């Protein structure tokens, strides 16, 4: 269970937009394709990404209206409130380490000695409890269930192996003065990005128990079993229209490993889209 992202992508703000440069290679295109999938549904709670050839993703900044509080921070706040002796113990034993290093040690202790000892179903409940507590009930258990369902379903379909405690959580809406579940973001390590040929082989052979995934269980199968499947109403015609508008050179897709894998996953989960259109046939008919 990782505590930080796989890649350390160079990032910068450019006006009201946030730009990320590929670190492993392929992250930007994956972010873009997953974003177009979401935009082809009625789901609204996500950060949209655009692709700048060859290796940059561009998204509107959710700041200053929203501030993101990762699950990592919520867990530490909960531990400090209900088990402050653990903080005291770690601080005494690691006086020469930085405060951030000590926070990581506390978190790691919680992961190893508590979180991993829970059933996967109980891990989900524990994180929901923490979110409801942290937000004073402004985010409900039903809100948490819908949110967890949305990102686990998305990650399962498109094989995002990097959903960690720093990229899911809650947001504070300064306009409304209240908390909400976070917008979905950070799907760059989907569609095989950062993985080796063994990973792709396991995907092709449907070996779901061998595909490593986070954050509740450690595999694709264990994660998807503990939450409800989110009913994304995918519209393949809308997807293609968006792709035509946003990507002038479709040759980029043909040169990428991600597009072939995305078509495969769409065919598995959406052999027919929400309107009854055969997804793979339609993509093929327009040259994709």
Place the predicted regions along the sequence by residue:
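Detector for Asparagine
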Residues: 8, 55, 83, 91-94, ...
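Short, hydrophobic/amphipathic alpha-helical patches that form generic packing surfaces
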Residues: 33-37, 150-159, 281, 285
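Extended low-complexity intrinsically disordered regions
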Residues: 92-132, 207-229, 237
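Conserved ATP-binding subdomain of kinase catalytic cores across diverse folds
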Residues: 1-115
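Short, structured coil/loop segments at alpha-helix boundaries
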Residues: 62, 76, 80, 137-144, ...
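Conserved kinase catalytic-core segment
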Residues: 26, 122-196
